[in-house]
Design a protein with these regions (language model features):
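Nucleotide/phosphate-binding catalytic cleft detector across ATP-hydrolyzing
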Residues: 1-3, 20, 29-35, 40-255, ...
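Asp-based phosphoryl-transfer active-site loop
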Residues: 2-12, 70, 260-266, 395-398
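Short glycine-rich, Thr/Ser-proximal phosphate-binding strand/loop in the N-terminal lobe
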Residues: 10-40, 97-101, 281-305
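Short, compositionally biased low-complexity segments
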Residues: 14, 18-21, 25, 205-209, ...
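Short acidic-glycine loop/turn motifs at beta-strand connectors
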Residues: 17-20, 272-275, 406
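Short acidic (Asp/Glu) and glycine-rich catalytic loops that position anionic groups and cofactors
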Residues: 23-26, 292, 298, 328-336, ...
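Long, internal scaffold/assembly segments composed of regular secondary structure
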Residues: 225-311
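A glycine- and small/hydrophobic-rich beta-loop-beta segment
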Residues: 308-373
Length: 471
């Protein structure tokens, strides 16, 4: 089986034995996006990867191909909800877990201009329409559907709101490509993302990827299974499941976190066994879920290098003298480090991207002193935000920079993300560490539907490469 990830910068391939799950080889090539004149094809880079693999493994030339893609801008999703703090926020989380980049979140208070911009300037690939709990208010999602149409939207819509309004909403949007799924927030404090996540994947394959004009060859759409972040998150879920049942782990696993440092964004995927308090309404109206993905659009190695420097400087992670390096990388996204000094600059930008992205995903825990009691003592309350990752057992580093920097440098970056935080950041405290330098997680996500046993074995092989953090 030949598993392919068409990325925005690199096309990565992994050749896997479909019976045993053994990784036979991997190769990468710059992603070949077609030019404005129509020349070139995204499959040119793939052909180069397959030819390279076939030199050592002749069966690669005829292997079955499964692919995912974030090339050409990936999957852009706009969320339309009712209450910003409930259904709109729930929709945003579902969109992220579906592998999309959220480009707009509209709610009841959004004005007419925002809906006009949706069709004219924002131009998402898919609109996710939510609103209302089951048995609750039906007007919100119906109004959202009307406002989408009034703004001139004619693209795909996934409806995942109050089930009582599905027929009316379906009638309103009947002329659009539409899929109606179960409510993502059936009741307050409950988030059910899976049905909508599957519908968004189907929309991506049926209506989105072909419109990006990445290839003129029919085999491109035939090999695609979904958006890259969606398949990677699926791979992380498989990895977490295997760790829980793997006797070699020696104990019950509490979770997995993956930090993926890209050129434009830094993504964090987590699958964590939740504390019962966290699964309910103790902190959030929209419940925390075991499977979470966050995307930081201002953190990255190239296109977002300057905003990474700004964020890193604000948090005391980067110095002023790194700014010229960040400016150069943002202006030249194809830049590759050639000297020790340039590699050291990449290391600093990567470490800042990963650290800040992980902090935003995990949040922090801190003691808040309240009002004095009758006895004269002040009450003390632990205030927590984000998702508690402190007991996570495995921390995985991914992304081109961690593959291309020297191994010891990549390990140093990953090691810096763990440990007890004096500032209360809920980062992994004592995890094992592993670098995904062979594109394994995307391959696991691609394989699991067709070859579940091979996917599980491949995931286990990655976990068994884990190391203990340096002291």
């Amino acid at each position: 089986m030949l598993c392919v990830d068409f990325g925005s910068t690199f096309t990565k391939t992994a050749l896997v034995d479909g019976s045993t799950g053994a990784l036979l080889g991997s190769a990468s090539h710059h992603t070949t996006i077609p030019g404005a004149d129509g020349s070139g094809d995204v499959l040119d880079g793939f052909d180069a990867c397959r030819a390279k693999l076939a030199q050592q493994h002749p069966n690669a030339a005829d292997a079955e191909v499964l692919a995912c893609s974030s090339a050409g801008g990936g999957l852009r999703i706009a969320v339309v909800g009712n209450e910003e703090l409930v259904t709109a926020e729930a929709g945003r989380r579902v969109a992220l877990s579906s592998g999309g980049k959220v480009v707009a979140v509209l709610g009841r208070t959004s004005d007419e201009a925002a809906y006009l911009e949706l069709a004219d300037t924002t131009r998402p690939d898919v609109v996710l329409l939510t609103g209302g709990t089951d048995g609750g208010d039906e007007d919100g999602i119906v109004t959202g559907a009307r406002r989408i149409l009034a703004g001139g939207w004619h693209g795909p819509v996934v409806v995942a709101g109050n089930s009582a309004a599905h027929v009316e909403v379906g009638d309103l949007l009947g002329d659009l490509p539409i899929v109606v799924m179960d409510n993502v927030v059936p009741r307050i404090g409950v988030l059910r993302p899976e049905p909508a996540r599957q519908a968004i994947r189907e929309m991506f394959l049926a209506h989105v990827i072909g419109g990006k004009h990445l290839s003129r060859r029919a085999d491109f759409t035939a090999m695609l299974r979904g958006a890259t972040p969606d398949l990677v998150l699926t791979g992380v879920e498989v990895l977490a499941a295997e760790l829980r049942r793997d006797p070699a782990s020696g104990h019950r696993m509490r979770g997995v976190v993956v930090v993926d440092i890209g050129g434009a964004t830094t993504d964090v995927h987590s699958v964590v066994e939740l504390d019962p308090e966290d699964a309910g309404l103790s902190r959030e109206v929209v419940a925390t879920t075991p499977v979470t993905r966050t995307v930081e659009g201002d953190l990255g190695m190239r296109w977002s290098a300057l905003s990474t420097w700004e964020a890193g400087r604000a948090e005391g992670l980067l110095d002023d003298d790194l700014r010229p390096a960040a400016v150069r990388r943002a202006a030249e996204p194809s830049f590759l480090p050639d000297t020790y000094a340039e590699r050291r600059e990449d290391e600093q930008i990567a470490a800042a991207s990963a650290t800040i992205a992980l902090r935003r995903h995990a949040g922090r825990s801190r003691v808040v002193v309240g009002l004095a009691t009758d006895a004269g003592d002040s009450s003390r309350v632990v205030e927590r935000t984000g998702k508690d990752l402190r007991e996570v057992d495995l921390l995985v580093g991914s992304g081109g920079v961690l593959r291309h920097l020297p191994l010891e440098v990549s390990r140093r970056i990953l090691d810096s993300l763990s440990g007890v935080s004096p500032q209360g950041w809920q980062q992994p405290e004592h995890p094992s560490l592993v670098l995904d330098r062979d594109y394994v997680l995307a391959a696991v996500g691609l394989l699991v539907e067709r070859r579940p046993a091979a996917a599980a074995a491949l995931a286990r092989s990655l976990s068994r490469c884990a190391e203990t953090p340096e002291s």
